């Protein structure tokens, strides 16, 4: 019994470490799929129909938002997130040349492909190595 309990505790500890060590995770909230980055709150938001891509950062008030950003709050479960978001739509033509992806391109270089994979690749490059 002690041996089984010891292995169970060891497995739970390892599972917890693996859970906390993940670089980013996806969370479904309403009709959007969010990818949270644990160190600085930036996210990629894709609407399945409208190809909307947002770049967001943590904020406490609308006054912290730049001219081309919108202040918004998002509820996930019992938590509320307050953010400044750049919310121009990508035109969804496959080459990522809508305003949303131009904004990401200007920040990080490279080209999007119109469906959010550019931002996913950026996350992979930055956090998975």
UniProtKB/Swiss-Prot annotation:
Q: Tissue range of expression?
A: Component of conchiolin, the organic matrix of nacre. Expressed at extremely high levels in the dorsal region of the mantle, which region may be responsible for the nacreous layer formation, but only in trace amounts at the mantle edge, which region may be responsible for the prismatic layer formation.
The annotated region (5 X 2 AA tandem repeats of N-G) lies at: 91-100
Q: Does the keyword Signal apply?
A: yes
Positions annotated as sequence repeat: 91-92, 93-94, 95-96, 97-98, 99-100
Organism superkingdom: Eukaryota
* Signal peptide interval: 1-23
Question: Which UniProt keywords are given for this protein, alphabetically ordered?
Answer: Disulfide bond, Extracellular matrix, Repeat, Secreted, Signal
CC per GO annotation: extracellular region
The record's subcellular locations are:
Secreted, Extracellular space, Extracellular matrix
Keyword Secreted in the entry? The reply is: yes
Q: Report the protein's function.
A: May be specifically involved in the formation of the nacreous layer.
Subunit comment: Heterooligomer; disulfide-linked. Pif97, Pif80, N16 and other proteins form a complex.
Q: What family classification does the UniProt entry report for this protein?
A: Belongs to the N16 matrix protein family.
Query: Which protein, by its recorded name, is this?
Result: N16.2 matrix protein
């Amino acid at each position: 019994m002690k041996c089984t309990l010891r292995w169970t505790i060891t497995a739970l500890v390892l599972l917890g470490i693996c859970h906390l060590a993940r670089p980013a995770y996806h969370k479904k909230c309403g009709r959007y799929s969010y990818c949270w980055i644990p160190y600085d709150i930036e996210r990629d938001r894709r609407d399945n129909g409208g190809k909307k891509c947002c770049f967001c950062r943590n904020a406490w008030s609308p006054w912290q938002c730049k001219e081309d950003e919108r202040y918004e709050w998002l509820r996930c479960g019992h938590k509320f997130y307050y953010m400044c978001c750049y919310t121009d739509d990508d035109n969804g033509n496959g080459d990522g040349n809508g305003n949303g992806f131009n904004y990401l391109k200007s920040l990080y270089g490279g080209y999007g492909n119109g469906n959010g994979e550019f931002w996913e690749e950026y996350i992979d490059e930055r956090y998975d190595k």
